[in-house]
Regions:
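ABC ATPase nucleotide-binding domains
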Residues: 1-128
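Non-catalytic connector elements of ABC transporters
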Residues: 136, 146-247
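Glycine-centered flexibility sites
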Residues: 24, 35-36, 109, 115, ...
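ABC transporter nucleotide-binding domain
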Residues: 116-148
Length: 247
């Protein structure tokens, strides 16, 4: 139907099989391939016709977690090697971050934000976007005053320094977006809190703490030789003012 000469068809097929690392498996039936190999066959079929744009509609949703990570790495490698424009539809935030040069976050059919993965993650325009891309804590605070390039907010009755943004006014309420990896627990010097969950996960320690009536999630990487806070302990929630985003 595409009127491609037989020799060119063969050359394209062999090139694409090599690209998706399926050389030597040309004669195998579908039921003789693993889940990951079947995904590569589907990708090869799409690439061999040399489309100008390739649409992926949640292609990894039926694979197990480890295979998903492996396949998204392969898809990114192949996309960059071929140089094709790809539109990748997914509800998996980690896939979106790992595969994209630019991300469009949709909310009920409307574009909520468009930008690079870094822009979306570090500078979300709304709570919806912040919560959709990665985990996020939201601390409500009323502005006390400006302090140079920073503002002082009252969070659950306690002062917290955050980056000042244009148009901030004393007495108005703002939302602090705090990522779990940007927060830390200290004996003192931060927002008073109480540990609600302390869970060792191998390479990191998960904490849930309550700051007043607000639950905050923290991820403490490389916990070896660090103090581990236990459930019920009182301590302080600390963060670098430059690591948070204000809405």
């Amino acid at each position: 139907l595409r009127k491609v000469p037989a020799d060119e068809i063969k050359n394209r097929v062999m090139h694409i099989l090599d690209l998706v690392e399926l050389t030597g498996m040309e004669a195998r039936m579908t039921n003789q391939l693993s889940g990951g190999q079947q995904q590569r066959v589907a990708l090869a079929r799409a690439l061999v016709i040399e489309p100008s744009v390739l649409l992926f509609d949640e292609p990894l949703s039926n694979l197990d977690a480890k295979l998903r990570v492996s396949m998204r790495t392969e898809i990114r490698r192949i996309q960059q090697e071929v140089g094709i424009t790809a539109v990748y539809v997914t509800h998996d935030q980690s896939e979106a971050m790992a595969l994209s040069d630019n991300i469009i976050v949709m909310n009920k059919g409307v574009v909520a934000q468009m930008g690079t993965p870094q822009e979306i993650y570090y500078h979300p325009v709304s709570e919806f976007v912040a919560d959709f891309i990665g985990e996020a804590n939201f601390l409500k605070g009323t502005m006390d005053c400006l302090d140079g390039d920073h503002a002082v907010l009252r969070v659950e009755g306690h002062p917290a320094r955050v980056p000042a943004k244009e148009g901030m006014e004393p007495g108005k309420e703002y939302t602090v977006v705090l990522r779990p990896e940007s927060a830390a627990l200290r004996d003192e010097g931060g927002l008073p809190c109480t540990v609600a969950l302390s869970c060792f996960m191998g390479s990191y320690q998960n904490y849930h703490v309550t700051v007043g009536n607000t639950l905050v999630k923290l991820t403490d990487y490389n916990p070896k030789n660090k103090r581990v806070y236990q459930v019920g302990e009182s301590c302080s929630l600390a963060f670098d003012p430059e690591s948070v985003h204000i809405l």
